From Swiss-Prot:
This is Enolase-phosphatase E1. Its EC number is 3.1.3.77. It comes from Alcanivorax borkumensis (strain ATCC 700651 / DSM 11573 / NCIMB 13689 / SK2). It catalyses: 5-methylsulfanyl-2,3-dioxopentyl phosphate + H2O = 1,2-dihydroxy-5-(methylsulfanyl)pent-1-en-3-one + phosphate. Gene3D superfamilies: 1.10.720.60, HAD superfamily/HAD-like (3.40.50.1000).
Amino acid sequence: MINAIITDIEGTTSSIAFVKEVLFPYAAKRFPDFLADHWDHPCVQEQIKAAEKESGETLGSADKAAALFLRWIEEDRKATPLKTLQGMIWKAGYENGDYTAHMYPDTAPALKKWHQKGIALYVYSSGSITAQKLFFGYSDAGDLTGLLSGYFDTTTGPKQETDSYRKIQQAIDKPANTLLFLSDIEAELDAAAEAGFNTCLLDRQQAGLESRHPVASNFNHINLAD
């Protein structure tokens, strides 16, 4: 019996294109001014110090820091300082109504159905927890945060490492064999399965993917009895 579902975002609840073509460029365009305007803010300086530690570089100015973060965006780095600062920038975009977060049409109805059945719902994404809350709070299906019991990001650990899922299981405090992890990335599902999770690969493009895991083209086709 499935007691909790943990879902990825990109390629799972939502289109990768929205993140790549809307959110990433929005943050990239605003990074230099954001850092210049908020350079002395403690929350920003905390991330600058973390970025210095991760990169081995000294980031003594907003311009130098912006150059590093823009390079990380180009490299699609899953660095926690980058994700945290992106979340701060995206917050303004959501609140200003510059965009709403994309959700596949089946996502919100399925989340609501599962929630009504008493299944606890969680998110595990490489985006920061702040960014995740904004994503589901300002979605094109409305505010979905009331359906979610919690969020996990890279501070828990990399998504392709089994220990990350063990930490999630401990935090949720339910047996691993009652947890279901949803993702479009095979290696993430492999790591979750190694931790004892049930898994399902989302094939949103209906590409006929072959997998060691159960495959579903959308949330309506996910079999909770597996």
